[in-house]
Amino acid sequence: LIPMLYAIYIKADIKNTFSLRLPKLRYILGGFIVWFGGYFIINITTRILISLFPEGADVLEAVNSSVMMDSFFASLIVVALIPAICEEILFRGFLLGAFKGESKKSKIWAVVMVGILFGIMHLNFIRIVPTAILGILFAYCALATKSIWTSVFMHFLNNGFSVCALYITQKYLRIAIDTNVTYTMPPISSILV
């Protein structure tokens, strides 16, 4: 909201400043492919960081648990939909629009800077690097498609997948506790970015 109000205040062209054009379907599909490939990179990066800094796993798990709600749909809205829209307007809309120039080099720097800022904004040490990688992918796709809706879709997909994974994990853990059966499950919730 603040970036939008500021853009209105400085009389910026809202549609161009925030790249609000609707993308073609092939760009959305391309965004899905980029996210899917990037998901493995951020998952591997997260696992490496957790193996190097095991104490970070507890903090990561606490953060993930704190944002989840009893209602799956409420969690989907709060953890996936709202951040996808608000964070993309700020990072891939306002900041990317402010940083990018006309040259290829300035666009590359803008994509990297916005990605790094996105990672830093998530504060948790274990999440900074994977989230920065994700932010770079989002920024690249927003710039390449000239639409933040591609990155909004990717962001929602990423966080929505994490919400689903957390709920599935919690369901199986409850079943295991209720039936006194032990399941070996990977730390799926560690992917919430």
Predicted ranges, named:
Residues 1, 77, 129-137, 157, ...:
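Membrane-embedded alpha-helical segments of multi-pass membrane proteins
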Residues 1-9, 30:
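Alpha-helical transmembrane segments in multi-pass membrane proteins
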Residues 15-86, 176-182:
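Juxtamembrane helix-loop-helix connectors linking adjacent transmembrane helices
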Residues 33-34, 82, 113-117, 129, ...:
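Hydrophobic residues within alpha-helical transmembrane segments
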Residues 86-113, 140-147:
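Membrane-interface helix/loop boundary segments of multi-pass membrane proteins
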Residues 120-126:
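Membrane-interface helix caps and helix-loop-helix hairpins in membrane proteins
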Residues 156-193:
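C-terminal membrane module of polytopic membrane proteins
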